[in-house]
């Protein structure tokens, strides 16, 4: 999570910061203390923008965290297609205060957005919001029940483990999205291996696989049958696997380190390039983006120096079976 103390430290160290942008919830469902962060940011007279792409369903039920539009954020971006019944590509930008000029936002939307928007997609957003407005209580009550029943049914797994929101300390997460199912492999296999078994043998597609866990996305549109299929599959897999030697996991902090910028992105892309082996890359400058997908956050950006630790981190991700994009 991002804490108010982290934000305060950065604002003190870099007084020319004009805007603070944070992601909450994260891809894994970790939620930061938006209200306290907003208070910290506003004390410096600047706005807070929250990337709440995975939190479009927040604020509709007491079983879920509040959404950032009600917690002091000045602008909030929600991908309604991720967790609400809307078409892929659809999202909402909320302007919540006058710290961000609406006229300026409209001006840049006119520059960056298409001049031929899809009315099908826009109508899909409206329909999604109508569904929420009409049946919110029923949908979220059923959703919360399904999640609770799933976690209760899978709590006695011997090797695999479905994380409970209570498993996170306040240092790790201010809050947690119960709709994200984090399934740990218990060092019985890699997350990638578990994802493959669930897909190939049970027809269940996970959202993401990491070193020793997978993430399952759920929503108000999931059914009792869908949750039962996943819990039954996990019980079957759990009965056939056992803990092995420790799998060397790698944390997001190790993967997404701050890198030294040697030249701008356009300079790096236009420069003469050559391909080298990863173990020989330390000391070179990246000529392309290197990232794990999902979620697509860059490990390296063109123009950044490649040090020994970063090269080894990329090699370790490959050994774990993670999807590393951007390598030749």
Where would I find each of the regions flagged by the language model?
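Conserved PLP-enzyme active-site core in the AAT-like
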Residues: 1-166, 185
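Conserved C-terminal alpha-helix-loop-beta "cap" of PLP-dependent enzymes
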Residues: 152-326
């Amino acid at each position: 999570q991002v804490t108010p103390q982290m934000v305060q430290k950065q604002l003190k160290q870099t007084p020319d910061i004009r805007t603070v942008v944070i992601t909450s919830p994260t891809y894994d469902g970790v939620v930061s203390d938006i209200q306290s962060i907003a208070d910290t940011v506003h004390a410096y007279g600047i706005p807070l923008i929250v990337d709440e792409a995975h939190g479009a369903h927040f604020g509709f039920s007491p079983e879920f965290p509040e959404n950032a539009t009600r917690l002091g954020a000045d602008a909030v971006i929600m991908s309604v297609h991720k967790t609400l019944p809307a078409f892929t590509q659809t999202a909402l930008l909320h302007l919540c205060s006058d710290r961000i000029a609406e006229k300026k936002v409209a001006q840049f939307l006119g520059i960056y957005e298409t001049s031929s928007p899809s009315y099908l997609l826009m109508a899909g957003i409206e329909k999604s919001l109508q569904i929420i407005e009409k049946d919110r209580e029923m949908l979220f009550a059923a959703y919360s029940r399904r999640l609770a029943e799933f976690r209760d049914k899978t709590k006695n797994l011997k090797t695999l483990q479905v994380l409970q929101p209570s498993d996170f300390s306040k240092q790790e997460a201010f809050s947690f999205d119960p709709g994200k199912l984090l399934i740990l492999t218990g060092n019985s296999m890699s997350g990638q291996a578990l994802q493959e078994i669930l897909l190939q043998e049970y027809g269940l597609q996970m959202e993401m696989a990491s070193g020793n866990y997978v993430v399952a996305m759920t929503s108000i549109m999931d059914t009792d049958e869908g949750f039962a299929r996943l819990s039954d599959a996990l019980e079957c897999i759990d009965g056939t696997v056992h803990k092995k030697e420790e799998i060397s996991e790698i944390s997001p902090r190790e993967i997404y380190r701050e890198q030294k910028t040697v030249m701008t992105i356009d300079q790096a892309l236009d420069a003469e390039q050559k391909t080298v082996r990863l173990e020989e890359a330390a000391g070179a400058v990246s000529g392309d983006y290197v990232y794990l997908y999902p979620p697509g956050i860059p490990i390296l950006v063109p123009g950044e120096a490649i040090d020994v630790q970063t090269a080894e981190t990329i090699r370790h991700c490959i050994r774990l079976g993670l999807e590393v994009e951007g390598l030749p």
